[in-house]
């Protein structure tokens, strides 16, 4: 029988994942820059996961979610969850992680999220398409965060 992971084991896994993410970018930029890249992606993954959880409940349409529209922004606002448009969802971005346009895709995702969530206007980082950010490393970082 498999042993369940303890909270400390999960914490170590997250710490290891974050260090691996930093290592992937370290060769192309200094620490002051790559922390914004990594933290922006972590935020994007977090809101996408929260959106996905509620989206699944809305699609099921059971209990308090009966008759709810899973693409209605107001359903998410009512639950204090950020609405994530299709082109900004983690699954979409992960599917495009190996493309040379992955940086632009992430910048576009951040713009789309800000457009649908006015409280985030001007807050999200949009520097992923810049030339000095290695797109192969960025794709690897997206894949790395997939398991986080």
What does each of the following model-derived ranges do?
Residues 1-148:
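Non-catalytic, mostly N-terminal accessory regions of nucleic-acid modification and defense proteins
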């Amino acid at each position: 029988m498999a042993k369940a992971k303890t909270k400390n084991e999960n914490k170590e896994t997250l710490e290891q994942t974050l260090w691996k993410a930093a290592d992937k970018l370290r060769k192309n930029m200094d620490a002051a820059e790559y922390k914004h890249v990594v933290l922006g992606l972590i935020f994007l993954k977090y809101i996408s996961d929260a959106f996905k959880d509620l989206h699944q409940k809305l699609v099921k349409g059971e209990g308090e979610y009966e008759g709810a529209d899973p693409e209605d922004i107001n359903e998410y606002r009512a639950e204090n969850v950020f609405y994530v448009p299709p082109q900004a969802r983690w699954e979409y971005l992960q599917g495009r992680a190996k493309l040379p346009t992955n940086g632009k895709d992430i910048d576009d995702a951040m713009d789309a999220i800000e457009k649908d969530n006015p409280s985030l206007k001007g807050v999200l980082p949009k520097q992923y398409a810049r030339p000095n950010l290695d797109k192969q490393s960025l794709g690897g970082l997206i894949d790395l965060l997939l398991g986080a």
